[in-house]
Amino acid sequence: MKKNIIMLVTGIVMLSGCDDLFSPAIDNFKDQEQVNSSSEYAQGMLLNCYRIIPGYYSDTDYATDDAVTNQKGNPYLNMATGNWTAADNPVNFWNQGYNTINVLNRFIANIDNVKWADDEEPARLFRMRVTGEAYGLRALFYYYLLRNHAGITDDGQLMGVPLFTTFLSSDANFNMPRATFSECVRQIISDLDSAEAKLPEEYENINSDSDIPAKYLGITKRKEVYNRVMGQYARQLFNGIIAKAIRSRVTLLAASPAFKGDQQAWGTAADAAAAVIDHVGGVDGLAANGVTYYCNTTEIDALKEGVNPKEILWRENIQTADDSQEQNNYPPSWFGKGMMNPTQNLVDAFPMANGYPISNPKSGYNAEDPYSGRDPRLSKYIFYNGSKGTADDGTGTSHDIAILTGSLSGTDDGINVKETSTRTGYYMKKHLRMDVNCNPSSNMKSLITYHV
């Protein structure tokens, strides 16, 4: 998930004499004293760290058994086929991750020196909030580093990544040994504990003084002060429920067989995931159409002010004119490039509607009619031969159009008909809005979208 947090850029021009006109200052670099005197400068450091959070798209599936692509030079395809190198590593996060962690370490060390507000109560609340944000972001960046760069050494040890929690100056020794995988997990969990202790689960305005959460009552008993710092204007910043979600991911990573996970680790991961699900009222608290959050037009069009449907914990800002996903992944007959092609392996993983896997004799699976009676998510997430999609003809009128992917289909949607055709007989449908028209001669405009 890269979040579109607005980058703070502040410029101050001071003309104090003729000499200043001919002696330019260092290009917009602020010294520590200037940062300490302005909460805007200090928050700018933190907001820039949000901007480094990796974007979440589905291209990584090309390196798995779930999808291939018709882009022959795709870096994830190179990973899958063994044609990648250290210099051409699409999952490399080393430099970005450590640069950002070092900024966060400096930010944490300097928090108490910054004037966060003129009045004491909001200043203390701001200090508490940004401290929680910084610890949470550091945990997130260490998670990405661990996920992308941990592994088993030649002598069989499971190693993580180097750990440092203090600011390192440019002349420091950066040649640090790797910590063990378990040490890294403990550090991430510790940072998440710190974040949850300081942050509200969600940033929402409260209606009365009595609604202030207990952990903030030692700072303020006034709702207007609480709302100023912890209210709705802080939506989309790191919060307590995001910390719980990252904890779930970290513990799931630790439970994975790829990292020598054991049965106890699976139990820990399940408990962490349950805490996130319980936050929205359990499985029954989710909307019935939540599986298609990406094309539920009513909900998407209603998004505003950082509000999310229950299926979404964290997302980018909405994009009001973006059809890049549709252009890249629609079938050729819909003027798309058909880039992501689900594999038969993924299609076979969808069970029958009765819950049985298709390999089970009780499933009722019919190889002569392979898509009938399947889990309804199959038709929502994947275009298969004969499946229908609701396409717009460019005038605002929608039609159900069958996608024919067989090699003898007689359309450009068939297997390997052209460069933009599927390689597997399937096209990705998940993440795509069905009311976008990619016909270059169409007058239909791109529509609202967002990434989670």
Specify the residue positions occupied by each region the protein language model found.
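Bacterial Sec-dependent N-terminal signal peptides
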Residues: 1-28
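Membrane-proximal, proline-rich intrinsically disordered regions
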Residues: 18-64, 98, 114, 297, ...
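Conserved, well-structured interaction surfaces
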Residues: 40, 44, 74-151, 169-204, ...
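Short coil/turn linking the two alpha-helices of tandem helical-hairpin repeats
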Residues: 146-148, 153, 203, 253-262
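Surface-exposed intrinsically disordered loops and tails
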Residues: 204-232, 285-302, 397, 404-417
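Polar, glycine-rich mid-to-C-terminal structural blocks
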Residues: 249, 255, 277-370, 376
